[in-house]
């Protein structure tokens, strides 16, 4: 990078708390932790670890944090470990606890920013696993703009039962099968026990793996690191190398906002489209771009979708898991295909100091013939990307649908209206939803939920009952990366602020049309105007605590559901 970005000293920030007579009390605190006088002048590097025994996604992070700390020390830096929280989507799913998931994204970003800036750290390594660790950590990196790198905790390996690979979504779908009488109780219990065999994040191209792949494409994580399994030795080696790379970035003055540019975000979103990634990536990259002060809208996703095909056959709508993608060449192989087709910006710089083109220089031009995970651009799974932005009188600000793999790209049917996920789930489990229905779940948006719960439980139950292709679902909430089917989320404006989804009545005709990118309430304008005049805003569900704060400050989902948009 250019000289103006290079710090005069590698401890340019931390010297504020280590240098001079007035900082003797500060140094005394460091001596208490084993620092020596020769350590002052070395960069202080935060290691923000989301390790916990809350979830398998994060239960294997401590060895990575220890490895990073040791490698930082060897590279001449002072590691400073601190924790950041996590909320398990898989455990909170379908309960009140899920309301805290998206909230935790903001808490994670705020907590890392607080420690990095409060302690004048010269750099930071963020180590995360579960879904919201990913955007929360990246938002903190670009907010603070101190040299930083993201170390993904790694994917879980698949479970196995009766010759079938399993993952966490297998269990959610098994619930629907069991309720429908299509699954033996013994098999149901064995799937439950075997689906998650150890530590690591959920194994398909679900939200955590989507974001890790995107961070690699963004240039903020090392090549190949996003598809490694948590329990494999190469993940520890990659973590150590990440620490060494960060120390070099500190010396060069290479900062996150030098890397996370508009072009780099285009690269990341292109990889999300090519790999069939999660709808949550739309919400999270709106938030990351906002934190980085990069102009970015939901229409940018649609622009990229139209030119980037889906070339990776990944679950939930495909066949393979992240461990399979890793063996097939990982994200660098996918990026090489996109770069050679002119679909990536090769000049974007990465945390290594190399450009994207330089990083990919020695990657094979074509994927291996003996694998089926990565296709070529001449033989894609789908000619266009899968995350479509839909609009219509139900969602004038836009909403998100995952349209790949649908046998029936359109549905018009009677609305089955529910004012919470819980009410909808009760109806689904009671078998009151039938083929041709369009389920509307509202008051689950950023403000109304609050927290935009993910609707994996309802969608998986529908799939398990054999209704995944014949029932539509529309919500102002979100979907898990494991969701597939005729589903539309992030409907904006949300019901809580009087968005049109609040005006839908039981039995109204509703259309979802993926090809026309339309989500429409088939009711006349005059009738909708009458309903709008009669609508009254509901009382907040929470008046104290973190959920109340999030509800007060959260923006529309079309703006990323961020909490600092209009401060």
Swiss-Prot record:
The active site is at residue 480. Mg(2+) binds at residues 89, 131-132, 454. It comes from the Bacteria. Keywords: 2Fe-2S, Amino-acid biosynthesis, Branched-chain amino acid biosynthesis, Iron, Iron-sulfur, Lyase, Magnesium, Metal-binding. Pfam families: ILV_EDD_C, ILVD_EDD_N. InterPro entries: DHAD_IlvD/Edd (IPR050165), Dihydro-acid_dehy_C (IPR042096), DihydroxyA_deHydtase (IPR004404), DiOHA_6PGluconate_deHydtase_CS (IPR020558), ILV_EDD_C (IPR056740), ILV_EDD_N (IPR000581), IlvD/EDD_N (IPR037237). One of its GO terms (biological process) is isoleucine biosynthetic process. The modification N6-carboxylysine is found at residue 132. Binds 1 [2Fe-2S] cluster per subunit. This cluster acts as a Lewis acid cofactor. It catalyses: (2R)-2,3-dihydroxy-3-methylbutanoate = 3-methyl-2-oxobutanoate + H2O; (2R,3R)-2,3-dihydroxy-3-methylpentanoate = (S)-3-methyl-2-oxopentanoate + H2O. One of its GO terms (molecular function) is magnesium ion binding. [2Fe-2S] cluster binds at residues 57, 130, 202. Pathway: Amino-acid biosynthesis; L-isoleucine biosynthesis; L-isoleucine from 2-oxobutanoate: step 3/4; Amino-acid biosynthesis; L-valine biosynthesis; L-valine from pyruvate: step 3/4. Its EC number is 4.2.1.9. Its cofactor is [2Fe-2S] cluster; Mg(2+). PANTHER family: DIHYDROXY-ACID DEHYDRATASE DAD, DIHYDROXY-ACID DEHYDRATASE, MITOCHONDRIAL. Functions in the biosynthesis of branched-chain amino acids. Catalyzes the dehydration of (2R,3R)-2,3-dihydroxy-3-methylpentanoate (2,3-dihydroxy-3-methylvalerate) into 2-oxo-3-methylpentanoate (2-oxo-3-methylvalerate) and of (2R)-2,3-dihydroxy-3-methylbutanoate (2,3-dihydroxyisovalerate) into 2-oxo-3-methylbutanoate (2-oxoisovalerate), the penultimate precursor to L-isoleucine and L-valine, respectively. NCBIfam families: ilvD, PRK00911.1. Belongs to the IlvD/Edd family. Homodimer. This is Dihydroxy-acid dehydratase 1. It comes from Aromatoleum aromaticum (strain DSM 19018 / LMG 30748 / EbN1). The lineage of its organism: Bacteria, Pseudomonadati, Pseudomonadota, Betaproteobacteria, Rhodocyclales.
């Amino acid at each position: 990078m250019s000289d103006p970005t290079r710090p005069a000293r590698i401890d340019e920030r931390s010297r504020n708390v280590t240098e001079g007579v007035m900082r003797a009390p500060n140094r005394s605190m460091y001596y208490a932790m084993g620092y020596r006088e020769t350590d002052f002048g070395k960069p202080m590097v935060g290691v923000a670890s989301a390790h916990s025994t809350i979830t398998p996604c994060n239960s294997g992070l401590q060895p990575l944090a220890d490895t990073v700390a040791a490698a930082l020390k060897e590279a001449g830096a002072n590691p400073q470990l601190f924790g950041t929280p996590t909320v398990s989507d898989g455990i909170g799913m379908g309960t009140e606890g899920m309301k805290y998931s998206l909230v935790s994204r903001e808490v994670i970003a705020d907590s890392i920013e607080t420690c990095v800036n409060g302690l004048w750290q010269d750099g930071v390594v963020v180590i995360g696993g579960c879904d919201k660790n990913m955007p929360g950590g990246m938002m903190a990196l670009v907010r603070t703009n101190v040299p930083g790198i993201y170390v993904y905790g790694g994917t879980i390996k698949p479970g196995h039962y009766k010759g079938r690979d399993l993952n966490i979504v297998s269990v959610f779908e098994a619930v629907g099968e069991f309720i429908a009488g299509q699954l033996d109780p013994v098999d149901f219990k064995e799937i439950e026990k075997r689906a998650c065999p150890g530590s690591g994040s959920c194994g398909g191209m679900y939200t955590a793996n989507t974001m890790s792949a995107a961070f690699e494409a963004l240039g903020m994580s090392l090549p190949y690191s996003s598809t490694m399994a948590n329990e494999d030795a190469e993940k520890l080696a990659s973590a150590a190398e990440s620490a060494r790379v960060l120390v070099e970035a500190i010396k060069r003055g290479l900062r996150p906002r030098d890397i996370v540019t508009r072009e780099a975000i285009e690269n990341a979103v292109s990889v999300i489209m090519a790999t069939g990634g999660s709808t949550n990536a739309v919400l999270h990259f709106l938030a990351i771009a906002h934190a980085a002060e990069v102009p970015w809208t939901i229409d940018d996703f649609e622009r990229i979708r139209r030119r980037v095909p889906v070339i990776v056959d990944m679950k939930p709508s495909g066949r393979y898991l992240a461990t399979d993608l890793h063996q097939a060449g990982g994200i660098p192989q996918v990026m090489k295909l996109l770069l050679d087709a002119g679909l990536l910006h090769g000049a974007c710089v990465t945390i290594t100091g190399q450009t994207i083109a330089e990083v990919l220089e020695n990657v094979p031009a074509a994927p291996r013939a003996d694998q089926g995970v990565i296709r070529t651009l001449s033989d894609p799974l789908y000619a266009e990307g899968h995350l479509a932005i839909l609009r219509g009188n139900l969602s004038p600000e836009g909403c998100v649908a995952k349209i790949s793999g649908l046998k029936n790209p359109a549905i018009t049917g009677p609305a089955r209206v529910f004012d919470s996920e819980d009410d909808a789930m009760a109806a689904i489990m009671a078998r009151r939803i039938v083929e041709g229905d369009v389920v509307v779940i509202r008051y689950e948006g950023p403000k109304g939920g609050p927290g935009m719960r993910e609707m994996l439980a309802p969608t998986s139950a529908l799939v398990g009952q054999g209704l995944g292709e014949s029932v539509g679902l529309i919500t102002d909430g979100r979907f898990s990366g494991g969701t597939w089917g005729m589903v539309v989320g992030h409907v904006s404006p949300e019901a809580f602020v009087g968005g049109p989804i609040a005006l839908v009545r039981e039995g109204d005709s509703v259309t979802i049309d993926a090809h026309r990118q339309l989500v429409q309430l088939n009711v006349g304008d005059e009738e909708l105007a009458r309903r709008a005049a009669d609508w009254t805003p509901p009382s907040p569900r929470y008046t104290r605590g973190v959920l109340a704060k999030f509800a007060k400050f959260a923006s529309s989902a079309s703006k990323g559901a961020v909490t600092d948009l209009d401060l």
